[in-house]
């Protein structure tokens, strides 16, 4: 494989490196309130574009079938909103014996209580070629569920409570997720033949939107003065976050590929991403509401600010590996299902 062909194949990973470097060099461009206005362009336009894109590319029957996949939905929601926070709470009982800042540890607990994001898990599932319809449903449903469940989890594990503006968050999610998806499905009905004939690069479009999300996320991270921690604490927290992500991705992978799970390789891809990703878009505003008045709010927020770009970075790097596994697994399953020719 020539160098140019290799670069073309790995354009997305190269793009990730470039946008992170660009964010580090001049974070003010993509930070909140900056020239790119990510609080509008990302929160509303980019997320809406992702789900409009999904509505255009997905067959209606695929979405309908995904709604009926109750076992998959239960697995994802129970893992991300029950098992995840409980496992982290147990893990933190051990970490509390170390010299790591206690507020950073509380921040790790808040990460575990967050709902799944409405965009990154869908884009990564699409990039691999997994069950995108299931990823869309679980990301959207998990986000709606998290609006109610996350404050209760924070109260349970950290003893924090506050009134959460459910109506405004629900309406924002509805307008940026449900409405664009429905519009995409309606438009698809009228241009279905053209879409099947031309086959637009929906995956590449979603990946470009994800690069924009990565860029603005890192701009916000690099421009945040509250992340000025001592090197030891920062390195340890980053290491722990990557360890948690890899461990839980492996765990969901093993569960969903076990002999009696009943999940397809495409289902496994959606499960791995949807079960382990956490929302920064909903998370940070929710932390500001729930922990209003806390002098350590900035420290509590740090793990989530690190977790979000880390999950996108790790997921993006693993896309080729997971895609290769999924294709080989599909091929193996197809061969085992073929009827044997009698001798």
UniProtKB/Swiss-Prot annotation:
One GO cellular component this record assigns the protein to is: Golgi membrane
User: What's a GO biological-process term for it?
Assistant: sodium ion transport
Q: Which residues lie on this side of the membrane: Cytoplasmic?
A: 1-9, 59-71, 138, 185-201, 256-270, 320-343
* Residues exposed to the Extracellular side: 31-37, 93-116, 160-163, 223-234, 292-298
Which Pfam families does its entry note?
Answer: SBF_like
Location of the protein in the cell:
Cell membrane; Endoplasmic reticulum membrane; Golgi apparatus membrane
Presence of the UniProt keyword Electron transport in the record? no
Q: Which residues cross the membrane?
A: 10-30, 38-58, 72-92, 117-137, 139-159, 164-184, 202-222, 235-255, 271-291, 299-319
Main location, first listed in the record? membrane
- Lipid bilayer topology: Multi-pass membrane protein
The alphabetized UniProt keywords are: Cell membrane, Endoplasmic reticulum, Golgi apparatus, Ion transport, Membrane, Sodium, Sodium transport, Symport, Transmembrane, Transmembrane helix, Transport
Which GO MF terms are attached to this record? symporter activity
Taxonomically, the superkingdom here is: Eukaryota
The UniProt family comment states: Belongs to the bile acid:sodium symporter (BASS) (TC 2.A.28) family.
The UniProt function text for this chain reads: Involved in teeth and skeletal development. Has an essential role in the biosynthesis and trafficking of glycosaminoglycans and glycoproteins to produce a proper functioning extracellular matrix. Required for extracellular matrix mineralization. Also involved in the regulation of cellular calcium homeostasis. Does not show transport activity towards bile acids or steroid sulfates.
Name of the featured protein: Sodium/bile acid cotransporter 7-B
Question: What organism is listed for this UniProt entry?
Answer: Xenopus laevis (African clawed frog)
